[in-house]
Amino acid sequence: MVKKFVYGTPFETEAVVKEIPSSEGNPDYGTFSTENGFSFTTKLADDDMVFGLGEANRGINKRGFLYISDCADDPNHVESKTSLYAAHNFIIISGKTHVGFFFDYPGTLRFDIGYTTSDTMTVSCENADLYVYMITGDSDLDIVKQFRGIIGRSYIAPKFAFGYGQSRWGYKTEDDFRTVVKKYRENHVPLDMVYMDIDYMQDYKDFTVNEERFPDFEGFVQDMKKEKIHLVPIIDAGVKVEEGYDIYEEGCEKGYFCRREDGSYFEATVWPGWTHFPDVLNADARKWFGDKYDVLVSKGIDAFWNDMNEPSIFYSQEGLADFKETAKKYVEGDPEVPHYMVGEKLQALANNHEDYKRFYHNVNGEQVRHDKVHNLFGYNMTRSAGEAFERISPDKRILMFSRSSYIGMHRYGGIWTGDNCSWWSHILLNLKMMPSLNMCGFLYTGADLGGFGTNTTRDLLLRWLALGVFTPLMRNHAALGTREQEPYQFEHIEDFRNVIGVRYRLVPYLYSEYMKAALNDDMYFKPLAFVYPDDKLARNTEDQLMIGNEIMIAPVYTQNAIGRYVYLPEEMMFVKFLGNGNMFQEILPKGIHYVEVALNEVPLFIRKGCAIPVADFAESVPDIKEESIRMVGYEGASYERYTDDGVSRI
């Protein structure tokens, strides 16, 4: 059962799309206060677990830490980070009873989940203007499905988006991209997408293409399609301030950029230099910005990724002036300005919360200060594209995913989990984020495989790819200046061909399970706790996940390991895709097992009485041969497979 409670005058985020009547008073769970902002406090029993929060740090069970919903462009994802790129304010308290809460609040929201006091959870925010939805049910999964039912259907990607993609910040020219595709095809490593980071643009201007680097962009797009490759250009949130740039001039003329309190347009620096931010909370501006995607769609592009949309700010005029003044005092020998203060001021320039208080959105004629609705920017930037695609391409799906998000954006696109690093711990973080994201409606998700920042290693990349085989978004992405990490940069490319090839062998199953989850408000990834709630060991296992109703995955995520321990909550069939293209199968009883997994192998476990469809190796999604599909698993088991053309809107 879902109950809605109204506090103050909430901002309409449109995260919830189902009409729910308001209930009087407070939820009959914990204590609520509006005396000093808003707070909700409840005691946690020793065996209570807290699930949710979507894209957040640490484990699947969120107990024992402080999480802050405050979309932040901070690539240093160490354990102490309290905020990442997204704000997903849905939690479930799971113990002897099950209860879920969605706090529909677009500003900064704090979740102290046993951090200050181990047996107490407090959710708080500065302003007591929000909707609180309380959901009760028979199980954690029941609560998730009820929640998903009120926030609307998850985004459905085109089928080609379930192939493998190669990306790197640093591909600049048409020749760079052609070389990547050529090397993949020559080495027979599967590939469906190549991503275009900011260097394809003219001076980092949205909806432009550098004509020197791409003299015939439309022809290039068509050439790639002949190779069965979809190009995926990036779009950033900031619009360059430049006379003669049509997007800038139109936005100024129509009043579609965010303004300061005095009515002037707010300026901040991002990649293009000084920029304005489109006022995507203004419905007219949102439509205007979304329609600009047609500039590239009309040239044959059918996939995009939105970035820098927290929105990221390098510095503002005020921030720069403050830094210069501090540096000047230090140079002049001011004893009140030690050297470290200059460094702190420099670091504080980027994404400074004071800057988010300096600009406003025009929402139905009312000026709303950005920091009050900060977490909605990435959501509404992607919404602008999603709504535009329905007009531009009414019959055909377009791939879209974003870095920043709020619940509600899940209807318009997926997300990737941002600028991770080439750390073994980030493989595990990737794994643990997946079910939490699914709880909040984000199904088309994945991480930068191999790690975005720092230098990867061959073994780390192979192990991460073996997890990426199962994530809907499977993309290798790396930062400028890091070690090149395309598979052909390493010895024994046949190992990469095999691991990535397993993805294509499993597409008939993975795509089917994704579509079932999207169409039925279900989870593609589930924690073991949701499937085996009465099994104490399963409830506390966080490095294994269930996919659909048929399989469990348990990737290897430690360096130099030749395998790992796995807990089976029931009898299962251990299936290992071997480096030579064959499969190893063994039925294992319930219990703890050590399974060996070589670097060029991909393991999975099929539940008792189940089977899954597996195809032959293919180099692109369109090349997967329907007649090659056979069932793998328990003899006599059946599987209901979802199929469609992978293109038409549903």
List PLM regions with ranges.
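Catalytic core of carbohydrate-active enzymes
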Residues: 63, 78, 376-377, 382-398, ...
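Short, hydrophobic/amphipathic alpha-helical packing segments
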Residues: 65-71, 84-87, 178, 286, ...
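Aromatic- and carboxylate-enriched substrate-binding clefts and catalytic-loop regions
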Residues: 190-496, 531-532
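Glycine-rich, histidine-containing beta strand-loop boundary motifs that form or position
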Residues: 42-44, 55, 94, 102-105, ...
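Extracellular structured ligand-interaction cores
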Residues: 85-89, 96-98, 106, 129, ...
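A residue-level signal for conserved active-site and pocket-lining positions in enzyme catalytic cores
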Residues: 90, 147, 184, 224, ...
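Catalytic and substrate-binding clefts that recognize carbohydrates or anionic sugar/phosphate headgroups
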Residues: 1-158, 168-170, 174, 181-186, ...
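Short acidic-glycine loop/turn motifs at beta-strand connectors
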Residues: 92-97, 260-262, 569-570, 579
